[in-house]
């Protein structure tokens, strides 16, 4: 009697064998990512030096030190899914990499820090996308996007948030019946004259809520709608 050649007689892999296969994929990937990270640091050195200066000197952006390490930890949490996903380098990422390089060069030439910082933290996730490929990058899409929180942006909102805070203060004072006079960001009442300062704008709270709210939603909620709703509520 002839044995059916299509019959699968292979035995399931032992845990040690499976771990060995995973290491064959994981170890080269770690080395490649480390090399890519080193090249990124070398190319974006000037942008990194200036952004660290802002992180250190402005308490609004102190969180910047933790964003990239946190993003890599989130990627580490997805390692099992990554190992079961085809990893194939993708040139599609060049549609982001090339403009980012040009933006970085323009930022250096014109000493425009915002351009340098935006390009720096757009290049890193884009290079990882190029290394892993589109399919694998979808598995870690949030950690890659999370890296953009490293960009120290938000101070531009301070004047607008100061106006909102002043409007809110005036509205509350009117409800109490206290006589007042407002001139720009200054509010005068019988007890004295007060300024709605930058610290009253709430920009630190706004940025922190955005970062923490996004992270919490990613880790604890599954639906895209729920995640978006939670982040929006956290900003209020």
Task: List the predicted regions and their residue ranges.
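Hydrophobic N-terminal alpha-helices or hydrophobic patches in metabolic proteins across all domains
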Residues: 2-236
């Amino acid at each position: 009697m002839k044995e059916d050649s299509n019959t699968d007689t292979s035995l399931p892999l032992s845990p040690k064998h499976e771990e060995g296969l995973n290491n064959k994929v994981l170890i080269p990937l770690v080395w490649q990512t480390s090399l890519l990270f080193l090249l990124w640091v070398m190319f974006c050195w000037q942008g990194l030096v200036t952004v660290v200066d802002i992180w250190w000197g402005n308490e609004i952006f102190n969180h910047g030190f933790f964003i990239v390490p946190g993003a890599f930890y989130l990627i580490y949490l997805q390692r099992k899914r990554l190992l079961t996903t085809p990893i194939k380098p993708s040139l599609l990422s060049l549609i982001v990499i090339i403009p980012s390089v040009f933006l970085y060069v323009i930022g250096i030439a014109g000493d425009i820090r915002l351009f340098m910082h935006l390009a720096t933290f757009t290049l890193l996730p884009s290079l990882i996308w190029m290394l892993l490929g589109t399919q694998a990058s979808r598995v870690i899409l949030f950690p890659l996007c999370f890296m953009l929180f490293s960009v120290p942006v938000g101070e531009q909102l301070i004047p607008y948030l100061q106006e909102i805070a002043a409007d809110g203060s005036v509205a509350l004072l009117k409800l109490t019946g206290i006589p007042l006079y407002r001139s720009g960001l200054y509010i005068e009442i019988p007890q004295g004259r007060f300024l709605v300062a930058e610290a009253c704008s709430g920009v630190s709270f706004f940025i922190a809520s955005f970062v923490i709210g996004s992270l919490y939603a990613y880790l604890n909620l599954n639906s895209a709608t729920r995640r978006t709703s939670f982040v929006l509520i956290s900003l209020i």
